[in-house]
Amino acid sequence: MKLTELCLKNFRNYSNLKLNFKKPIILFFGANAQGKTNLLEAIYYLATGKSHRAQKEKELIRWETSGFYLKGELEKEQAQYTLEIITNYQNGKNKNLKVNNLSQTNTRNFLKTMNVVIFSPEDLMLVKGTPDNRRRFIDQEITQVDPSYDFYLKNYFKALRQRNKLLKTYQDKNTLAQHLPPWNQQLVHYGSKIILKREEVIHKIRLLARLIYRKITNQTENLELDYSPSLEFEDCKFREQLSGEKLAHKFLNTLNENLQSDIEKRTTSIGPHRDDLIFKINNKDARQFGSQGQQRTTVLALKMAELEMIKGEKGEFPILLLDDVLSELDDNRKKHLLNLTEGRVQTFVTSTSMEDFNGDVDIKAKSQVFRIDNGEAVKLNAGNQE
């Protein structure tokens, strides 16, 4: 799939911008805080309906305006699509999603149109960062291939907030026994779906990332990726054979068993919101024992595995967004990433300098280059790419 046109109005620091893309690699370069990442954010938002960095949608609206407009022209192997997002906060929140000029009442119909994989400097902390970062990574990946997963997440966390509110309000076990069951049922229903989907997708990524990691390290190192749910299972084989019904039964029983502990802690101690991913390199915990180079190779392998998995699920590669990460990769890792994408994956790259590409004239020849300066984009020809 290829994005051939991008329009922004009152989005971040852009008042009105229209860009056309004709080459497989699009480079946005310029000084910091000029709006390079905002362009990738706009593309990501068109694909997912959310920002990868803003907590509140209002943060995306240009100063002293009441809403923003995004449009993308998308070419896929079987069809062409016009995607539009119109927001207005003048009289409360108003958000309209359109595909080919038709408003979408079902958000999932919009989200299944375009797929993206984003790789940013924050991702380099995936291995040694917090479990929350790793959960967010896998949840974003799953939503790309199964938009209904986002529905499960929203309903799960809605039930979780209500359950935690009750745990903070009441300390009497008998009183809680009357109020908790409806929210326990919601947690179990949606939480079981989340756990099963995470296990399914992590299994696919595990196999792909292992092969890619071996290739990057010239067959000298092995990467293992394990799903670590907060629910305790007897062994891995038992977990893999779990049906939704058995999992739901175990989840509910564990919630009831942990009730006294949850009352004391005033929070829910088990569930998908406590899950984690474990990375091992040559059977050692990469978080504790992996070098910085090994950890970066792990993240690179994961991102490349994302591309391949979405290709397998959707039939074509997603769009790749590289947000100021090439300067963080050595020549070997950069080469593997660009070789994988070359000729197959439309790639948008941000950088503060064209020096990131000085060793690769071929990439420059295949690229469209835009200099970004204070919310303005100037297209450069080959002679101006300095």
UniProtKB/Swiss-Prot annotation:
GO terms for molecular function: ATP binding; single-stranded DNA binding. Keywords: ATP-binding, Cytoplasm, DNA damage, DNA repair, DNA replication, DNA-binding, Nucleotide-binding, SOS response. It comes from the Bacteria. The keyword Aminoacyl-tRNA synthetase does not apply. GO terms for cellular component: cytoplasm. It holds the Pfam family SMC_N. ATP binds at residues 30-37. Transmembrane segments: none annotated. The keyword Mitochondrion does not apply. One of its GO terms (biological process) is double-strand break repair. It is found in: Cytoplasm. Belongs to the RecF family. The RecF protein is involved in DNA metabolism; it is required for DNA replication and normal SOS inducibility. RecF binds preferentially to single-stranded, linear DNA. It also seems to bind ATP. This is DNA replication and repair protein RecF. It comes from Natranaerobius thermophilus (strain ATCC BAA-1301 / DSM 18059 / JW/NM-WN-LF). The gene is recF.
